[in-house]
């Protein structure tokens, strides 16, 4: 099993189900000194008729004054491969990064996904359907309300 720190739409049970990933032992975790934003260029833009502008997907970046809330997932080797495919690790969209997160039980080492620099775009917002997946996951796992509100604000 591999422990992954999931954030953004990867917290949404329906998204995980679509990827054929079981939500084993999910637990809330906090990644300090990182910031959440919709700064990863969406690879859906060319496929969606409603995309009249470039839209952002979830990403995290180092920032000493911020923190990112998410969940830890215990993934099998085949689920890790599915997640890697979904996140585009083989095509240069995201890369896997080791991190240490804080849980109620203490510090846990995990892997998360971070967008490659050449896939970043500033000052963008997500498509509404994507934002809803992010918010649904955050609410499902009962992340702090002020954090959920900050995600909502980023999406507008």
List each model region and its residues.
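Glycine-aromatic micro-motifs
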Residues: 1-156
């Amino acid at each position: 099993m591999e422990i992954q720190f999931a954030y953004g739409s990867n917290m949404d049970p329906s998204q995980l189900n679509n990827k054929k990933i079981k939500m084993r032992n999910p637990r809330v975790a906090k990644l300090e000194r990182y910031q959440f934003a919709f700064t990863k260029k969406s690879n859906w833009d060319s496929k969606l008729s409603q995309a009249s502008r470039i839209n952002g997907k979830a990403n995290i970046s180092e920032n000493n004054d911020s923190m990112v809330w998410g969940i830890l997932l215990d993934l099998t080797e085949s689920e890790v491969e599915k997640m890697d495919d979904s996140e585009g690790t083989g095509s240069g969209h995201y890369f896997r990064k080791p991190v240490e997160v804080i849980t109620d039980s203490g510090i846990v080492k995990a892997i998360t996904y971070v967008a490659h620099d050449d896939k970043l775009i500033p000052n963008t917002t997500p498509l509404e359907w994507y934002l809803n997946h992010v918010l649904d996951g955050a609410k499902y796992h009962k992340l702090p309300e002020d954090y959920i509100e900050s995600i909502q604000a980023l999406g507008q």
